[in-house]
Regions:
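Short, solvent-exposed loop/turn segments at the edges of secondary structure
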Residues: 104, 181-185
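Hydrophobic alpha-helical positions that pack around
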Residues: 5-125, 137-140
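Eukaryotic mixed-charge, acidic/polar low-complexity intrinsically disordered regions
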Residues: 159-182
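Short beta-strand elements
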Residues: 47-50, 110-113, 171-178, 190-192
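Residue-level detector of conserved catalytic or cofactor/ligand-binding positions
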Residues: 4, 195-201
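Short, structural beta-strand-to-alpha-helix junction motif
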Residues: 127-132
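Terminal amphipathic helices with adjacent charged low-complexity linkers/tails
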Residues: 143-147, 152-167
């Protein structure tokens, strides 16, 4: 789909040379890597695009100084780029209207595993785990679970138990940091295997 979108943009004069007669040139190319998790780190990603094994480089220098092919390189994820057009159209104050103080905007989460409705969602920062699980995810299959793994391998687990209940945890940077977790990749994994977490029941 990405290649089709690029082709359509080229056909309509929205990419390539002299875009819409503006004198501005801009091309997009898709580089497919081996899918290594480490390539989420900027210098590992540029190394992979260059055709080498995706391995992080020692910093400094940062990629904005010496990145892809040793040239200054801006790296942002797709979610960041998706936020730019509506902010340009509606202004920063509009964007700040979503989410709590210091955690403005929206966030994409991927619901996977043992919830009724899996898939990609976008919610305002500060939406609670309870809202995500029950209002959007449709609840957990079987009804009982002990934890939600958030943010990929380095994100952490939010426990649901008699002594530690994170159902009303706000999903934003500051709230998660207080409990030793982080948004990371935005993954929210609900899995039957989590039922077997070692804990007295």
């Amino acid at each position: 789909y990405k290649r089709q979108a690029i082709d359509k943009a080229m056909d309509r004069g929205l990419l390539g040379k002299d875009i819409l007669g503006s004198g501005f040139d801009f091309d997009l190319h898709i580089s497919q890597g081996a899918g290594a998790f480490v390539c989420g780190e900027g210098s590992a990603l540029t190394t992979s695009i260059e055709g080498n094994r995706g391995m992080p480089r020692v910093k400094p220098p940062r990629t904005v100084e010496h990145g892809l092919f040793d040239k200054p390189t801006v790296l942002n994820n797709v979610e960041t780029f998706c936020n730019v057009p509506p902010i340009l159209l509606n202004g920063a104050k509009w964007y700040q209207g979503y989410g709590p103080a210091n955690n403005h905007g929206t966030k994409a989460f991927a619901l996977t595993g043992n919830v009724q409705n899996t898939g990609l969602i976008e919610v305002p920062m500060g939406t609670t785990l309870r809202e995500v699980i029950f209002d959007i995810g449709g609840g957990v299959k079987g009804g009982a679970f002990k934890a939600v793994q958030i943010g990929g391998p380095s994100g952490g687990c939010l426990c649901i138990s008699a002594t530690e209940d994170h159902l009303d945890m706000k999903l934003d940077f500051d709230s998660l940091k207080k409990v030793g977790a982080m948004i990371g990749s935005g993954g929210l994994a609900f899995d039957l295997s989590l039922i077997h977490i070692s804990e007295p029941t």
